Amino acid sequence: MNSLVSTTAIEAQSQAAASEEVVRLTDVKRRFGTTAALDGISLTVKRGEILGIIGRSGAGKSTLIRCLNGLERADSGEILIEGRDITGLSEQELQPLRRRIGMIFQHFNLLSAKTVEENVALPLKIEGLAKSERLKRAHELLELVGLADKAKAYPASLSGGQKQRVGIARALAARPALLLSDEATSALDPETTRSILALLKDINRKLGLTILLITHEMEVVRGIADRVAVIDAGRIVEEGQVWSVFANPQAEITGSLLCGIRPQLPEHIAGRLSAAAGSEAILSVDLAGPQAQGALFAELSAALPHSFRLVHGGIDHIQNQPVARFFIAVPARDPALAGKVEQFLTARSARVEVLGYDTDHA
């Protein structure tokens, strides 16, 4: 009896967990000739979550998003959308499932001969909904995206940001469970990008909408995502909470993608670093959480007086978590000093790397 109860409880927990997953990919593979576009992708997206998938051009992002909406067929693996595996479905069977998936693109794909409200209502017209119901839904969505006064306008009169808002409204027309965003802000200027990201975050909060973002811009992930997955050569090489990945990138590609938005060693110092011991060892120090607030260096100074000087760095806040990166110089007069400093910092959860020696510092 106890065994039966235990088994039933486990099954119930498993079903409950599955119901919270809008997307689950397991070992998904897709090849084009000899090229592995997707090479064993596994990830989940929970209901109401915003997941950012980031990678360089050619990493497999576009193939992944096409597999998610059934436009591309995976060679193997499972792709579950709300618990249903779509990999074996016929084109006819895919149609109702696609209505559960909205999509926005880099290019807005609006019909120039249709008004804004007609563009938004188009998916509902295809479904056969009555005109009055279509327009009612279109007006609700235009209110949501801040374009209620543009219902009768034509796309040619809209700015790029306004066109993308129409695209978002159209993607939400059929009340999808999942919104896919394929580089939706890459053609927009920085200010418009921020406004579109704020809109998506607001929609996520108001509707509980699950969003999967494909992008090559870390700023987009930083501004909106709950979690991030880094894709490279068709594989997920790193995944985690955005603040954690930003604070402590594990994969080389992640560090490279972060270069533009994390503090970097000034070029005039980086250019003269040497592997040979010089007058100062240059260390990078990455911190997250309470230690990132700066007290750690006061502790280091007290424990090891005159052991370092601060060269460069800064503190940021991501998902309400302080994240910091600093560069310090440690005198090489005592060969063991850099090791002592590194040991002190790593014992307090800092990520430390000796970058080289500044031989020109007096």
Curated annotation (Swiss-Prot):
It is a peripheral membrane protein. Residues 23-258 form the ABC transporter domain. It comes from the Bacteria. One of its GO terms (molecular function) is ABC-type D-methionine transporter activity. Pfam families: ABC_tran (PF00005), NIL (PF09383). ATP binds at residues 55-62. Its EC number is 7.4.2.11. The keyword Cell inner membrane applies. SMART domains: AAA, NIL. InterPro entries: AAA+_ATPase, ABC_transporter-like_ATP-bd, ABC_transporter-like_CS, ACT-like_dom_sf, MetN_ABC, MetN_ABC_transporter-like, NIL_domain, P-loop_NTPase. It catalyses: L-methionine(out) + ATP + H2O = L-methionine(in) + ADP + phosphate + H(+); D-methionine(out) + ATP + H2O = D-methionine(in) + ADP + phosphate + H(+). Keywords: Amino-acid transport, ATP-binding, Cell inner membrane, Cell membrane, Membrane, Nucleotide-binding, Plasmid, Translocase, Transport. GO terms for cellular component: plasma membrane. It is found in: Cell inner membrane. The keyword Membrane applies. The complex is composed of two ATP-binding proteins (MetN), two transmembrane proteins (MetI) and a solute-binding protein (MetQ). Part of the ABC transporter complex MetNIQ involved in methionine import. Responsible for energy coupling to the transport system. Belongs to the ABC transporter superfamily. Methionine importer (TC 3.A.1.24) family. This is Methionine import ATP-binding protein MetN.
